[in-house]
Amino acid sequence: RAALGASESMRSKLAEYNDPRLSRAFITKLDKEKEGKAQAPGTPDTDVYAPSGTPEQGTSKYGTSLFMYSATAPTLLMSFHELKFLEAEALCRLGRDAKSALKEAVVAGLLNAENSFSISRKELGNTLLNPASAITEEEANSYFDNTVEATYTNEPLKTTMIQKYFALWGASGRSEEHTSELQ
């Protein structure tokens, strides 16, 4: 696991959408002087994020996703947010309004990610330095209303699929639903 690295492509996609997971999802590599890992900022940083396709090989070279430490998070066969994303996707493909289903999916996906982040914080204990504040339901709703809804209006299916991609990333440790999606 020491050869894993935080993804620059995921960081940049989360930043593009101003997604609240960005402030919680990544941690720096071990700071030996401070004896811990810090919550990584969402700004580009080659010491934290591995460049897509050209990472430098080595152990503990980059930061990692906080999801790596969510070992005791539940493994979901089918989560509520996945079900709502499937509904939103089907409605989009039928040319119908999917905004309500998409909002439920996005909010539930953010809160599920926060559950994994909280579990990871417990796993890391006080070795996680300056952790970012938790994603709240209010923040998740605001993210949808102020960011996602505008892109949904212009590109409903694309927005649904991107938000689904974000929500399935790290979904409770290992996600059966994501494996199924890839097949």
What are these regions (language model features)?
Residues 1-87, 93, 99-163, 167, ...:
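Hydrophobic-face positions in mid-chain alpha helices that act as interaction patches
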Residues 177-183:
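Conserved small/polar residues in nucleotide/adenosyl-binding loops
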